[in-house]
Amino acid sequence: MLNPIIIKPWIKKFKAFLLCWSLSFAVIHAQNSLTKTIAADSVNSIEINGNQIFNISVTTTKNNKILVSSTLDGEYQNKYQIALKQEGTQLFLALNYVSFEDIPDDKRNANKVIAATLKVEIPEDLMLNIKSDVGSVNVTGQFESIFIELLQGYCNVVGKASSATINTIDGNIKVATNNAVINANSKHGNSKADLLKPSENVWHLYSINGDITVVKQE
């Protein structure tokens, strides 16, 4: 007669710990992360090509540096990277394909092969321009101007700008600001705006299917 094998409780817990640790280790190393810092002395405009980037976050600081952080995940993550290029006073950021290997035709659509997020910290009072096909955008801080155009994602802005234009197709637009003239219109969605103190700052908010909400910044 075979003796039963008894697994002690502490062994079960230890194995569970090893499994969780292994999974955590795999998740950490499964991502392609990148951080870059550059001087902002000669930069007055940030141009973000957000195509194929799912989440874009921009925040202003009192520092005179630009900090760019990106995380890429997915089957072909190592074949892409966030590229920075300065032309005159403009800094361009985009997700570029950097591999010499071809991606199979059935996986050409980038959202099948990579999930990208981008976080950018910039000095105050710069111009910010963002366009994206799939991305959602969160913006916080003080800007000279803001221009955002999104095909699918939403847009949240908390801060100030001398002028702003935000266009979405399906995504909602939420703005918290003050001392501004607001022109908001959604073709198939709802628009709601708090009464703000009039000023020379003008914001144009447009959406086809998304809702637009404007509140006074506390």
What are these regions (language model features)?
Residues 129-166:
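Right-handed parallel beta-helix
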Residues 1-35:
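Bacterial Sec-dependent N-terminal signal peptides
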Residues 190-192:
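Membrane-helix boundary connector in multi-pass membrane proteins
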